[in-house]
Amino acid sequence: MPKLGMREIRRAQLIDATLRSIDEAGLPGTTLASVAQRANISTGIVSHYFGDKDGLLEATMRHVLRDLWAATTRRRAAASDAPRARLRAVVAANFDDTQISAPVMKTWLAFWSQSMHEPTLRRLQRVNTRRLHSNLCAEFAKTLPRARAREAASGLAALIDGLWLRGALAGEPLDTKAALKLANDYIDQLLAPRV
């Protein structure tokens, strides 16, 4: 009988191997066998924990999304209650170290592509999109009329995704300082008093 906690340890090991496999071989080159080889275990164990490749990608993305939510929660807790500070915290979480490593960025790209074809992954993407929009909208609504807050949240979410996507596709490390400056300048413009 396995030790208490062995399941969680094994799943984490396999998720790490999946991230590395997607980084090195892309999603098409990532198989249960390639993940098993990277983790030095049998393919049967990978199949036991995740069922198939889609289950493996889903579990890996749930892990990445938990990291994103933890970064968001941590950064919002450290920010002041001012909407500008809390918006900046949400932006910074999306460019957190847990979200911009090559393995994670390539996994995000693979996930987005697969989410157009797999209902379970599509649902995860919708949850993530709604969570981001809700967080942004709640902060903008503290200083802007409701309709304007929704527009601002949609615009900032698109900017975050666009900056992140361009960074992921650049083929070099993401310039988080430049991305944060652009997003924070956009927040400042949206919250500036109108004359």
UniProtKB/Swiss-Prot annotation:
Q: Which residues form the HTH tetR-type domain?
A: 8-68
Q: In which pathway does it act?
A: Amine and polyamine biosynthesis; betaine biosynthesis via choline pathway [regulation]
PANTHER family reported for this sequence: HTH-TYPE TRANSCRIPTIONAL REGULATOR BETI (PTHR30055:SF234), HTH-TYPE TRANSCRIPTIONAL REGULATOR RUTR (PTHR30055)
Q: Which Pfam families does this one have?
A: TetR_C_6, TetR_N
- The answer on whether this UniProt entry bears the keyword Transcription regulation reads yes
**DNA-binding region as annotated in the record:** 31-50
Query: Which key words tag this protein in UniProt?
Result: DNA-binding, Repressor, Transcription, Transcription regulation
What HAMAP family does the record point to? HTH_type_BetI (MF_00768)
Molecular functions per Gene Ontology? DNA-binding transcription factor activity; transcription cis-regulatory region binding
Question: Which PROSITE patterns does this chain map to?
Answer: HTH_TETR_1, HTH_TETR_2
Tell me the GO BP annotations in alphabetical order.
Answer: glycine betaine biosynthetic process from choline; negative regulation of DNA-templated transcription
- What job does this protein perform? Repressor involved in the biosynthesis of the osmoprotectant glycine betaine. It represses transcription of the choline transporter BetT and the genes of BetAB involved in the synthesis of glycine betaine.
Where are the annotated coiled coils located? none
Q: Output the superkingdom of the source species.
A: Bacteria
> Which Gene3D superfamilies has this protein been placed in?
Tetracycline Repressor, domain 2 (1.10.357.10)
What's the protein name? HTH-type transcriptional regulator BetI
